[in-house]
Regions:
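Short acidic-aromatic low-complexity motifs
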Residues: 2-38
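Short, surface-exposed coil-to-beta transition loops
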Residues: 71-72, 108-113, 129
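Exposed beta-sheet edge and beta->alpha loop/turn motif
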Residues: 89-120
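Low-complexity, intrinsically disordered terminal/linker segments enriched in charged
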Residues: 125-145
Length: 145
């Protein structure tokens, strides 16, 4: 029998597949399986929270329009029965408009950290991101930090 910790590790590996896969229908199938429909996601790209797997994927799709070769690589994770702390490496080339910034052609490589909270049904119900978006905005000249 699989432990809850092993289940949560498998969820995060499947989540990596969800955000990196190029087939939208497959991504949406995985999003429905992995993300609670009422899970709120806060992001600088929207003044209101985005909800559920479709909300989460809308951020992925925005990133893909702005960085056509965007990839997220799961570098490390620490998992318990209720959450997963994940370090991602995000790479891509800024070749589309991003938050009002015209394409620069700059390549980005950013380390991002997220905490994912997983309910008893094995669905992500909360995502708390560290400074990841700042790491994207800074090399594009969208923030002066």
């Amino acid at each position: 029998m699989t432990s809850i910790i092993d289940r949560n590790k498998a969820i995060m590996k499947k989540f990596e597949t969800m955000i990196c896969h190029q087939d939208t229908a497959y991504q949406e199938k995985l999003a429905e399986e992995l993300v609670d429909s009422s899970a709120p996601f806060l992001t600088p790209i929207s003044p209101e929270p985005l909800y559920g797997g479709k909300g989460y994927l809308s951020v992925v799709y925005l990133m893909r329009k702005s960085f056509s070769d965007v990839q997220w690589k799961l570098v490390d994770m620490a998992v318990d029965e209720e959450k997963a702390a994940v370090t991602w490496e995000l790479t891509g080339t800024h070749d589309g408009d991003f938050m009002g910034k015209k394409p620069t052609g700059k390549k980005i490589k950013v380390c991002v950290m997220n905490f994912y909270y997983i309910n008893k049904d094995g669905k992500i119900y909360k995502d708390v991101a560290a400074e990841g978006m700042i790491g994207i905005l800074r090399p594009l000249g969208l923030v002066n930090a």
